[in-house]
Amino acid sequence: LENNGDEYIAYDSRETDTDKLIERVKDADVVVLANQPFPAEVVEKCEKLKMISVAFTGVDHVAVDECKKRGICVCNAAGYSTNAVSELVFGLIISLYRKINEGKENMTSGVKMAPGIELSGKKFGIIGTGAIGLKTAEIAKTFGCEVYAYSRTEKHIDGIKYITLCDLMRTCDIISVHVPLNDSTKDLVSSMLIDEMKSDAILINTARGPIIDNAALAKALKDGKIAGAGIDVFDTEPPLAPDYPLLDAPNTVLMPHIGFSTKEALYKRAVITINNITSWKSGEPQNVV
């Protein structure tokens, strides 16, 4: 930014107080943010704001509609975390299938572990076939999985069979969520659909927490109705309250929203975020949402 002749002020923490957030950004022409919520009431107070560069793929935490009404350009860091997130999907799956957490505990207890499970030959269901969903499908095929998908926009790709969401939930051994969070996907994986899952199926969510009914998921795990879950995203950002329902659910691998966080992805994110600003300044904005 300095090399481009821009003056900037950096903050090293999220601001949860709306008035304090407004104080930070009210005089800015451009705001760069990652997972800092940026609601309409803040946008309304930013009379000089012309552009927001979101250093994230999802923009559900930004009042995009209010920005559009005010002619504020919003760009995201599309594609920066595709490899990072899709690779974590398989880290979660293998942790569940090969009981990696349990293995560490058994190093000193001497308790015999139950056999693990292989990915090869499993029916792998993908909800949402955007960039991350398709990359996940590609990796799943290399493991020898049969890949099924549900998406509002179907793509003609060899090795992916599109089916209904209900059929996917009912028949797949592994279900991985990759849709963005919006009004139509909130609680998409509902209690009713979780009840449709096979007893030996596992559910993976590296997309957004509110897409899944997490209370229903926790109950299904505690009741033994499904085999496990690997979750990197929650209804609220970690740290979670001690009574959050998934924290004491069995057969889970929980991560504190780090799917995007690899050295390679964070470098790519920084490059895209700055390029979004320079492209906008030159009159040719990119990655506009």
What is the role of each PLM region?
Residues R70-I72, A77-K123, I127, K135-E138, ...:
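Phosphate-binding beta-alpha-beta segment of Rossmann-like dinucleotide-binding domains, i.e.
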Residues L1-A28, Y148:
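N-terminal glycine-/charge-rich "phosphate-binding" loop or analogous flexible N-terminal tail
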Residues A114-S199:
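Rossmann-like dinucleotide/phosphate-binding beta-alpha-beta segment
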Residues Q36, T57, S151, D173, ...:
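Short glycine-/small-residue-rich Rossmann-like dinucleotide-binding loops
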